[in-house]
């Protein structure tokens, strides 16, 4: 035996890590949706506003869904496999 104790992470640390991942996912997904909406608006819809709002809505919804999955998981942070 090496005599070293294994210290588990406190639940507060795990919760903070989860919030960091959820908020960063939400910002990234919303930004990607905004960008895709602007791109679609310029190319296909004669610069109307609805594709931008639709893209932002999809981004927020996807970020919320992933955040919900992260908080519902029992094993800490979820690993995404491609």
UniProtKB/Swiss-Prot annotation:
Subcellular location per the Swiss-Prot or TrEMBL entry: Mitochondrion inner membrane
Tagged with keyword Membrane: yes
Example of a GO cellular component annotation carried by this entry: mitochondrion
Membrane topology value: Single-pass membrane protein
Topological domain ranges for the Mitochondrial intermembrane compartment: 44-82
Residue intervals passing through the bilayer: 21-43
Function in brief: Component of the MICOS complex, a large protein complex of the mitochondrial inner membrane that plays crucial roles in the maintenance of crista junctions, inner membrane architecture, and formation of contact sites to the outer membrane.
Protein's UniProt name: MICOS complex subunit MIC10
Organism of origin: Eremothecium gossypii (strain ATCC 10895 / CBS 109.51 / FGSC 9923 / NRRL Y-1056) (Yeast)
């Amino acid at each position: 035996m090496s005599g070293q104790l294994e210290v588990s992470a406190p639940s507060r640390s795990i919760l903070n890590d989860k919030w960091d991942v959820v908020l960063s996912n939400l910002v990234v997904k919303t930004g990607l949706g905004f960008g895709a909406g602007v791109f679609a608006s310029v190319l296909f819809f004669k610069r109307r506003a609805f594709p931008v709002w639709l893209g932002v809505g999809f981004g927020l919804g996807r970020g919320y869904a992933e955040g919900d999955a992260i908080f519902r998981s029992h094993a800490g942070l979820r690993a995404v496999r491609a």
